[in-house]
């Protein structure tokens, strides 16, 4: 009976804290997307961080573009409830999603797809960190105590994590952006986190191993989940239209590049001549050429 009473009390405290927070102002860059779930990005199109409250503690999806963002999220956590960060799940290993791990771990356990640790260690460079710290006194202060925190757990292909009342399903996204991309699906909440496979009005950075056909397969998989809420790696959360628009873009890009290859155009000619309608206001235009290169690889196999 005592155990039952304690459990009920804990659950009541959790929901009371969650309800109370709905009236609080976490800051101008936080958006509530579901009960107990908040998305943060300091600047539009920078990496998102998501706070997921559970009865057993906080789950974070990524840790922020910079440690300054991570500390803002930590301040929000203190307003939300006196809960510890239980898990940090990374959608990718790049620094704009992982550099703030040291702010939350310990106690947070970091989870990512296999290959993330190797990628993070390879990219970790003291000179790069010093350059980032030199941006401003505030940024230098935010980096105090910095150390590289790599995943404690690496999964392969698929993993299911049950935390309190919430279930999180992790799926590997192959060749979509980094060496270790993860889509995260919350079936009860009908939310999907797309990693940087999908962004909003923003050209992706397509490294030489990125495959647009594989990216389209990942988008198809995520659409098949029938999500109500889509949280991209970069950009505002929204509906399944986010997936539809990115799918449309990649299909159009592949089709146009394929037609130009068939007409005898070289890669350089395609990059100079091809314009995709509807992308005029997209950010990251310097990345458009590598989008064309990825489409060219997808069409020709070269």
Language model feature labels by segment:
Residues 30-75, 182-196:
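Conserved beta-strand hairpin/beta-sheet module of binuclear metal-dependent hydrolase folds
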Residues 25-27, 31-33, 57-59, 63-67, 118-252, ...:
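Metallo-beta-lactamase
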Residues 30, 55-59, 67-112:
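Active-site metal-binding motif and surrounding structural segment of the metallo-beta-lactamase
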Residues 36, 52, 62, 77, ...:
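Divalent metal-coordination and catalytic microenvironments
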Residues 15-18, 24, 224-225, 237-302:
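Accessory terminal helices/loops
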Residues 45, 63-70, 94-97, 113, ...:
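Solvent-exposed, acidic/flexible segments
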Residues 1-12, 19-20:
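Bacterial N-terminal signal peptides that target proteins for export
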């Amino acid at each position: 009976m005592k155990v039952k009473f304690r459990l009920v009390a804990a659950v009541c405290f959790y929901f009371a804290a969650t309800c109370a927070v709905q009236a609080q102002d976490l800051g101008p860059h936080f958006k509530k997307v579901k009960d107990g779930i908040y998305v943060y990005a300091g600047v539009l199109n920078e990496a998102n961080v998501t706070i997921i409250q559970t009865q057993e503690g906080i789950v974070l999806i990524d840790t922020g573009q910079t440690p300054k963002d991570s500390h803002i999220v930590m301040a929000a956590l203190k307003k939300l409830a006196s809960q510890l960060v239980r898990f940090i799940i990374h959608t990718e290993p790049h620094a704009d999603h992982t550099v703030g791990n040291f702010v939350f771990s310990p106690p947070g356990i970091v989870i990512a797809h296999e290959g993330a640790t190797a990628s993070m260690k390879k990219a970790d460079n003291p000179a790069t960190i010093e350059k980032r710290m030199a941006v401003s006194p505030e940024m230098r202060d935010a980096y105090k105590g910095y150390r590289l925190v790599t995943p404690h757990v690496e999964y392969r292909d698929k993993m299911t994590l049950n935390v309190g009342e919430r279930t999180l399903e992790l799926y590997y996204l192959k060749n979509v952006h980094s060496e270790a991309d993860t889509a995260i699906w919350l079936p009860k909440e009908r939310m999907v986190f797309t990693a940087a496979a999908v962004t909003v009005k923003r050209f992706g950075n397509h490294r030489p191993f990125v495959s647009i056909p594989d990216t389209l397969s990942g988008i198809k998989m995520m659409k098949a989940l029938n999500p109500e809420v889509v949280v991209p790696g970069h950009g505002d959360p929204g509906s399944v239209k986010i997936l539809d628009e990115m799918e449309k873009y990649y299909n159009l890009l592949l089709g146009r590049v394929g037609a130009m290859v068939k007409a005898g155009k070289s890669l350089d000619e395609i990059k100079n001549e091809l314009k995709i309608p509807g992308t005029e206001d997209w950010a990251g235009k310097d990345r458009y050429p590598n989008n064309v290169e990825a489409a060219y690889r997808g069409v020709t196999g070269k």
